Amino acid sequence: MVTTPNRSLLAAIKPYFEAGPLGALALGMASGTPYAMIAATLTTRLAESGIEKKSVTAFGLALLVYSFKPLWAPLIDRVRIPVLANLIGQRRAWLVVSIIMASAAITWLGLLDPTADLALFAAAAVAVGFAGATLDIVIDAIRIEWLRVDQMGAGSGMTQYGWRMGSYLAGAGALLLAAGGSWALAYASAVLLFAPSLIAAAVLGEPQRPPALQSGKGLSAAIKDSIIAPLADFLTRKGAWIVLAFVLVHKIGDTVCQLSVRLFYNDLGFTKEEVAFYDVSLGLFGYLAGVFLGGLIYKRVGLAGSVFLSLILMGVSNAAYAGLAIIGHDVWALALVQGFENLASGIGGVTVGAWLALLCDRRFTATQFALLSSAAAILGRAFSSGTAGALIESLGYVDFYWLTTVLALPGVLIFLWLWRAGLVVADDTVETATGA
């Protein structure tokens, strides 16, 4: 009997080390890299260059490109890249091409000086955003198609682990290399983080897809199958519009908060080395702990309860930044705030991410997941890019971060309504996914 707890622990962690979830880990690393280079890392670089707050937060528009993924996701579901697709398969061919695009764009951005030509620098940032968004479409499709239904929770967790590892290594590595005086080297080195995803794709092979999606058809049929059918499939389900409303609003507060954080740290006087260690490094451990806890909570509490808990935690974590604004420059306070924020984000990434994956019909994986994941961030990115800088200047950081906490409430309330209405079932099924 004394071995029961050990067996329970082994049973809990075993799914994370199966082939599909391990592949998701490698894919997540690739996904997090471009995002890191145009999010917090770019904000630090611009703030350090003396660019005014309004212009710095406006660069969040480069991230807004991610929100338009559904516009070209159908192409990735349907279009075969000549020669390469015949050699390694459609999904893996797109993976190789999108990684080449992202590597070139990241390297270009690192070579430019924002003080010399801000417009060209912005164009390069948008190019990284487009390449990263394309890579995300491919990665999400491969990940979901690699995983069995019973692996979705572990697979979502490992994706979050990988994403945070990629963004951590890219972000912290960039800060440390830049501290030595070379942003170009910092950006060029980040492309090495794409290698694990290519290795995973080589080992696990081309994911299996429904035969109906692999056959060639005429243009009108292709448009219907790749654009109209995925949207109609999702939007005609019971409660789909309410689910979409939740997806649109639940991350507004968190997105607005996070896109201003590096600017906030710069104004508080934290050095690049302090941010790299206390924010990025210690934050990573908080996030990894959150991902692990998220997987356990998902398994023990069920889908609905775990998502609701994570929404509460993510909202409360925004208020912690208001506390840091009051305290000021204090590395221990920074470590505490980042630890809690990343813990909450890790839990939320697993639970909400698993729900979004379960909502996807495998016939339209790339298109539907691109729609859901981009909708989850579009309002927050648009709001923060257009008004965050002005709000910080007019409200100050304390009131600004209280505002981001309030912005998290609509998502909590909508999800609570969905849960009570029976549109989210706690036994790892989602009623809207079946149309029941």
At which residue positions do the language-model features occur?
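Juxtamembrane intracellular "pre-TM" segments in multi-pass secondary transporters
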Residues: 3-17, 209-242
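Helix-loop boundary and gating motifs at the non-cytosolic
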Residues: 6-66, 241-246, 250-264, 268-271, ...
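Transmembrane alpha-helices of Major Facilitator/SLC transporters
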Residues: 65-72, 278-300, 310, 314-317
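Glycine-rich segments within core transmembrane alpha-helices of 12-TM secondary carriers
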Residues: 66-69, 153-178, 375-385
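Helix-to-loop junctions at the C-terminal end of transmembrane segments
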Residues: 69-87, 289-306, 392-393
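C-terminal ends and interior cores of transmembrane alpha-helices
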Residues: 93-115, 312-329
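Symmetry-related core transmembrane helices of the 12-TM Major Facilitator Superfamily/SLC fold
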Residues: 97-103, 185-203, 401-417
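C-terminal transmembrane helical hairpin of 12-TM major facilitator-type secondary transporters
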Residues: 305-352
